[in-house]
A protein has these predicted regions:
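Aromatic-lined substrate-binding rim segments of carbohydrate-active enzymes
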Residues: 58-137, 151-156, 164, 196-210, ...
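Extracellular glycoside hydrolase catalytic/binding regions
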Residues: 21, 53-56, 60-61, 142-172, ...
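Localized chelating/binding microdomains
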Residues: 35, 40, 54, 67, ...
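Short active-site-proximal "capping" loops at secondary-structure junctions
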Residues: 47-49, 85-89, 215, 223-224
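A mature extracytoplasmic/lumenal domain signature
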Residues: 43, 84-86, 132-134, 177, ...
Length: 344
């Protein structure tokens, strides 16, 4: 029979040891030879660049690739979360019209740019979490605290991404960004159902294409992706539950780490999708990095940008898009760069 995460004949998803397909086993993400995968790096904005480049007439995939080169070759990251950004209209939340705002279902050139960026990252031997970050299909039902969840419309976007990257072993897929509210867990079951449906949409595309199941990251059920506890007793069921990772965003003091990721990581494969100097001190960040490495949890800093705080880069853009600017680390960036220089 077909084993979830493997190729249709049930054999190893990659053809042999050392090949690049990832899979989950127990509470870890592993490489083809069974070794625990040690992925770490940072978030990287797509061509929209945290709204910094949406107004420019041209689009700049080459700039995203240049920053990926810096992050991988110089800072020594081997894992990048590529944050996809789209809006409901050219003017939503903006005093002037954006030139670039449509999502992958409506802007073929944007999707092609994303493919070229992801191919570029993969050619360098790094993995990329292709993640919906700002997307108009996310639920916005603040009246019932369903904000930031994936919807049926989101699932259509995820299906397109799954088809686009179906044969790319270096790609992981992120369902959404940050489910908000639900601090008391009262909506956990409904949030879980939305996530499970999203994973099912991706698996349907993969199975139809006859390709291995990619790692899919589902986000914490509330508190801006901070709550993983429901998944401990209710792991995702779609696709047999295999090759699903559980993504948490951490901007808290070290005392909160057990409830945020340490406890969940005892039984679940966890990804820390964001962390950084916001409410955290440098000491808190260093504790997180040490604990993540000890527990073999992939982790991604926020963010390799100059105006999307907490910023890893100094703003040398003169307030613009930043094409060709010097990629100079901030103090936060230097802290991350120093840690990435230490082998894990």
């Amino acid at each position: 029979m077909t084993v979830p995460g493997n190729v249709p004949d049930g054999t190893s998803p990659d053809g042999g040891p050392g090949a690049p397909w990832l899979h989950t086993s127990a509470n870890h993400i592993r490489t083809a030879d069974g070794s625990v995968w040690h992925g770490r790096g940072a978030n990287l904005s797509d061509t929209r660049s945290c709204n910094a480049c949406t107004y420019a007439t041209a689009s700049y995939p080459g700039e995203v690739m240049r920053r990926a080169d810096e992050l991988i070759d110089v800072w020594k990251a081997n894992f990048i979360r590529l944050d996809l950004e789209s809006y409901a209209s050219a003017t939503v939340g903006s005093p002037t019209a954006r030139a670039h705002w449509q999502g992958v279902l409506d802007d073929a050139a944007y999707l092609a740019e994303l493919k070229s960026i992801v191919d570029h990252i993969g050619a360098k031997g790094a993995y990329v979490l292709v993640s919906l970050w700002a997307d108009p299909t996310f639920s916005q039902r603040s009246d019932v605290s369903e904000v930031g969840w994936p919807t049926a419309q989101t699932n259509a976007v995820l299906a397109e991404l799954a088809a686009t990257f179906a044969s790319d072993p270096h790609v992981l897929l992120g369902v959404c960004n940050e489910p908000q509210g639900n601090f008391d867990g009262a909506l956990d079951a409904r949030a879980w159902a939305a996530m499970d449906s999203a994973v099912a949409a991706i698996r349907s595309v993969e199975d139809a294409a006859g390709v291995p199941h990619h790692i899919v990251a589902v986000q914490g059920t509330g508190g801006w992706a901070r709550r993983l506890d429901y998944y401990v007793t209710h792991p995702i069921a779609a696709g047999g539950g295999a090759n699903v990772a559980y993504e948490v965003h951490v901007y808290n003091r070290a005392a909160d780490f057990p409830s945020l990721f340490v406890n969940a990581a005892q039984t679940l494969p966890v990804i820390i999708g964001e962390f950084g100097l916001a409410n955290m001190t440098e000491g808190d960040v260093q504790v997180l990095q040490r604990r993540a490495e000890q527990l073999e949890i992939p982790h991604l800093a926020w963010t390799f940008h100059m105006r999307c705080p907490p910023n890893l880069l100094v703003d040398n853009s003169a307030g613009g898009c930043g094409v060709g600017m010097e990629l100079q680390p901030t103090a936060w960036g230097q802290l991350l760069k120093n840690r990435l220089a230490i082998p894990w």
